[in-house]
């Protein structure tokens, strides 16, 4: 997910995406603890996507 794609989305879409990404991260961490996670880079990628969304929201002045 690129920053330009995120900047085109509305604030509501970004907040929904943030909620979805955080749930995905929890799920990935659970899979890692159980030992079923095969792609260990997925956690890092998800964290970076969360950071990108938060950056765009903060640029808009949205407090979270």
Curated annotation (Swiss-Prot):
One of its GO terms (molecular function) is structural constituent of ribosome. One of its GO terms (biological process) is translation. Pfam families: Ribosomal_L29 (PF00831). It comes from the Bacteria. The keyword Ribosomal protein applies. CDD domains: Ribosomal_L29_HIP. Keywords: Ribonucleoprotein, Ribosomal protein. Gene3D superfamilies: 1.10.287.310. GO terms for cellular component: cytosolic large ribosomal subunit. HAMAP family: Ribosomal_uL29. Belongs to the universal ribosomal protein uL29 family. This is Large ribosomal subunit protein uL29. It comes from Coprothermobacter proteolyticus (strain ATCC 35245 / DSM 5265 / OCM 4 / BT). The lineage of its organism: Bacteria, Pseudomonadati, Coprothermobacterota, Coprothermobacteria, Coprothermobacterales.
